Amino acid sequence: MRILTVSPDQYERYRSFLKQMHRLRATVFGGRLEWDVSIIAGEERDQYDNFKPSYLLAITDSGRVAGCVRLLPACGPTMLEQTFSQLLEMGSLAAHSGMVESSRFCVDTSLVSRRDASQLHLATLTLFAGIIEWSMASGYTEIVTATDLRFERILKRAGWPMRRLGEPTAIGNTIAIAGRLPADRASFEQVCPPGYYSIPRIDVAAIRSAA
């Protein structure tokens, strides 16, 4: 499994992967989690996809998107500050140039059967490592996110605990929480699964031929 970084200038080139990503988001957020999200033609999107985020995709050897996450600079429009500000103790992020927001993190558990010793899916750990690696390479020192208590426990088990930015709050059918995570070498080494590999550009033909 590999991490593919899709920056705004690469949206068109990797359109098929992004289509898979939006379908996965619809399956996970609209289907399995039953969140109140907008799904059109089988794809989940929201207004934050219009702000030219970078996407990290966990790609299997057969060319399937096994997981994804969206990354936006915290100094610009973010889901946490504009949509879920009630999760923030002070009502705002106090964003700075070294802060990035992670959102729409999800994994297709049906594609991934291999687990590590702590029973976390390989795709989850691969994405954790990818987020930290991308953040450090992009000049960010911390990551902020809105998630739920279940995912907070997953982060803790992975050895990458989240520092809360407010109290747990009921939103829809989940108990949500906001927090910050360090983006540093120690965190990367803690979560990085064996065989981790990332590439900023990906050869689709090569991936398919390796299947």
UniProtKB/Swiss-Prot annotation:
Molecular function GO labels: N-acyl homoserine lactone synthase activity
Disulfide bonds: none
Gene: traI
InterPro entries (alphabetical): Acyl_CoA_acyltransferase, Autoind_synth_CS, Autoind_synthase
EC assignment: 2.3.1.184
Signal peptide: none
TM region(s), chain numbering: none
Pfam families on file: Autoind_synth
Keywords carried by this UniProt record: Autoinducer synthesis, Conjugation, Plasmid, Quorum sensing, S-adenosyl-L-methionine, Transferase
Keyword S-adenosyl-L-methionine: yes
Family, per entry: Belongs to the autoinducer synthase family.
Protein task: Required for the synthesis of OHHL (N-(3-oxohexanoyl)-L-homoserine lactone), an autoinducer molecule which binds to TraR and thus acts in the control of conjugal transfer.
Enzyme class, broadest EC rank: transferase
Biological process terms in GO annotation: quorum sensing; signal transduction
Statement: the UniProt record of this protein carries the keyword S-adenosyl-L-methionine: yes
Catalyzed reactions per annotation: a fatty acyl-[ACP] + S-adenosyl-L-methionine = an N-acyl-L-homoserine lactone + S-methyl-5'-thioadenosine + holo-[ACP] + H(+)
Protein's UniProt name: Acyl-homoserine-lactone synthase
